[in-house]
Amino acid sequence: MSEAEARPTNFIRQIIDEDLASGKHTTVHTRFPPEPNGYLHIGHAKSICLNFGIAQDYQGQCNLRFDDTNPVKEDIEYVDSIKNDVEWLGFHWSGDIRYSSDYFDQLHAYAVELINKGLAYVDELTPEQIREYRGTLTAPGKNSPFRDRSVEENLALFEKMRTGGFEEGKACLRAKIDMASPFIVMRDPVLYRIKFAEHHQTGNKWCIYPMYDFTHCISDALEGITHSLCTLEFQDNRRLYDWVLDNITIPVHPRQYEFSRLNLEYTVMSKRKLNLLVTDKHVEGWDDPRMPTISGLRRRGYTAASIREFCKRIGVTKQDNTIEMASLESCIREDLNENAPRAMAVIDPVKLVIENYPQGESEMVTMPNHPNKPEMGSREVPFSGEIWIDRADFREEANKQYKRLVMGKEVRLRNAYVIKAERVEKDAEGNITTIFCTYDADTLSKDPADGRKVKGVIHWVSAAHALPIEIRLYDRLFSVPNPGAAEDFLSVINPESLVIKRGYGEPSLKAAVAGKAFQFEREGYFCLDSRYATADKLVFNRTVGLRDTWAKAGE
């Protein structure tokens, strides 16, 4: 496949191809401009892959710029987290990290230019009055009584704002556009507001801060961005983006293009709702493995490659739609099926004793680390006469469809022997505590000599060598596909989104490291937890099951 064939195609790339072919641009320069007021989620990953991916494919540049214009909500913690997420996804920004606050002096100068042109004014309406005067989608707004102040008065008042002469909420700078515009964003939008708050980059130098719509377009222009890519909710804002650049003295005028945001089933993307989940302790934090945050997905065991593949598959369009969670899960399942080494762990253990196995003895059984990749090598796993198997792998009675261990019948232990269930012991409540079996000593990794067929295979862990492990069975956070549509989204949290089990793993799992996934044979894909696991306590998170159990539930 050629490089051109390997590239994804979408309407944005078609625009870029046309711009390069026509000579409108000779290079491509994009940017990813998050506000550092929270953790990035899977929706941001789509934008990261789009902006950085385009820059890579066209040998261009992509800036990482923090839109840090609201010191009240922003924190250096989020700056560091976002940088880490972008790098973990496999991307590198061009040059130094940028901050919108780098341009505060220039932004202030452009605001003064608009005042001098009679295109901006200081308004002393309260925020509530501004909302009231703005009108509605069906009714035009009305002019502020402060709209027709002279240039000189506006310059003096804006300087008074800058030097702390007004209290918060008592004055703001607004663009003078059209209060009757059919687009509410064009009804004299606020350009600057007062906030007496220390900024993580500029300290206490400023007490006036520019709004997003004023900052964003100018920052793009100052950085020479050729294609400013935003999600569809900013479509109307493009009019203001162009108005600002058309009315200031700036040599570059980037163009904004909008694409659909990522909506994913069984979760929420709203920063407000995600924050509520954290602050009300419905989850453990922003990196909870049930969260759609990049840090949560990483802790759960998702790989950067699987997230990039997911973003590639869903594509870039102007059509809003909701992606099935199964699509994301399919990407990580395919990745780990191909790349994760195998190991054995028993999640719901019951003791099995092989009565005719030499008492007190054990042996090593050779197992491949991957059934289809001999280059991944093999490992030695201890076997003994007492093992743990999963409780679901034994029944006293069963029909022909049940291919595991049944009383009086045989099954193969993975890469070991054929065993036959002879009897069980139970506790006072009737629960099986021990299964007693016999084994065929001539069947180590081979069929019985007499030709009898043994169809079932189950996994196991030697009891004498087993590592106690905590297993966190994570599932979808919500029980309905569209929790955001519920009257109370918290009421549809899945009560089974986290089930904690205590089981046993094979000794090789002692070497597990956070971020390195395993396939626990016949169970699913798991990784060591980065928060709770210690040298003395192994905690594994289920990344995803071997198959989509939700599809079955919906049938």
Curated annotation (Swiss-Prot):
The segment annotated Interaction with tRNA runs over: 317-324
* Cross-referenced CDD domains: GlnRS_core
Motif 'KMSKS' region: where in chain: 268-272
Source organism per UniProt: Salmonella newport (strain SL254)
- GO CC list: cytosol
Sites where the protein binds L-glutamine: D67, Y212
Entry annotated with the keyword Cytoplasm? yes
Family statement: Belongs to the class-I aminoacyl-tRNA synthetase family.
**Protein name, please?**
Glutamine--tRNA ligase
The lineage, from the top, is:
Bacteria, Pseudomonadati, Pseudomonadota, Gammaproteobacteria, Enterobacterales
Instruction: Give the domain of life.
Output: Bacteria
